[in-house]
Amino acid sequence: MKTLGEFIVEKQQDFSHATGELTALLSAIKLGAKIIHRDINKAGLVDILGTSGVSNVQGEVQMKLDLYANEKLKAALKARGEVAGIASEEEDDIVIFEGDRAENAKYVVLMDPLDGSSNIDVNVSVGTIFSIYRRITPIGQPVTEKDFLQPGHRQVAAGYVVYGSSTMLVYTTGCGVHAFTYDPSLGVFCLSHEKVQFPPNGNMYSINEGNYIKFPMGVKKYIKYCQEQDEATQRPYTTRYIGSLVADFHRNLLKGGIYIYPSTASHPSGKLRLLYECNPMAFLAEQAGGKASDGANRILDITPSKLHQRVPFFVGSKSMVEKAESFMAEFPDE
């Protein structure tokens, strides 16, 4: 049984120039995930459920657990000294870590500390998403927003933790996707899925059909396609939508499928955040043989213009994303 720590160190040896800093950074994320896992499991027994009464920069009311997870991850990353600063869905602006170690650190981290946190109250799976970049400003001085506004193809690592019937950490450093299941009796993540690949075709589509009337025509046509009877393509497909990006993505990664959060009449730019949600999931998807786009363009090629930028998101098995894109191209302005 190989642990996450052993696996990371083993892979580090494949790179002669590796310094161990990225390994230490991933270890900090692992620690943060353990703390969040522990406290999610007793969330109903302590006062960390419900809303905080505070709104974030997007105008959304933050859950208590959102803020709690944000603080725990931020503290874990700051303590290691391998991170120059972070950007978080729960922070209005970038957070610059102070001190000589931070100013000399190579990396910045972007994160959604607790995706799907509104599901906690009803005991549904939630997750943590993270994305790691090399800073582009000179070493030895504080980072700036420019270090965070990089296109997704510059990520050096990305991953997520899904807190469900078991807790799993899934990550990539650009050399495939690997998944580790947490053993709470030992306090370690153990390798359970190596070199995970999206099935090339799937029979599940994940979308909130309650918003159907607001969807672009291309999305409506694709949903209709998914629901039609056709033995050759094993249709109709099955709808599976949890309402937590991490949980929906994780299921589709293992079983095959597509996740869609399109633009709508009320959210013409989409609702998911490019930097905290779409880029890391797109990196994972491509490393697992899948595809991710905004319905027309590769997610990882989008150059962000602001921290909390939103985009439409199509991600999953490659053939399914390409079919959805074909409908979007056929009905571009409807």
Swiss-Prot record:
Mg(2+) 1 binds at residues 89, 112, 114. Mg(2+) 2 binds at residues 112, 115, 277. Binds 2 magnesium ions per subunit. Pathway: Carbohydrate biosynthesis; gluconeogenesis. The keyword Cytoplasm applies. SUPFAM superfamilies: Carbohydrate phosphatase (SSF56655). GO terms for biological process: fructose 1,6-bisphosphate metabolic process; fructose 6-phosphate metabolic process; fructose metabolic process; gluconeogenesis; sucrose biosynthetic process. Its EC number is 3.1.3.11. It holds the Pfam family FBPase. InterPro entries: FBPase_C_dom (IPR044015), FBPase_class-1 (IPR000146), FBPase_N (IPR033391), FBPtase (IPR028343), Fructose_bisphosphatase_AS (IPR020548). PROSITE patterns: FBPASE. It is found in: Cytoplasm. Keywords: Carbohydrate metabolism, Cytoplasm, Hydrolase, Magnesium, Metal-binding. HAMAP family: FBPase_class1 (MF_01855). This is Fructose-1,6-bisphosphatase class 1. It comes from Photorhabdus laumondii subsp. laumondii (strain DSM 15139 / CIP 105565 / TT01).
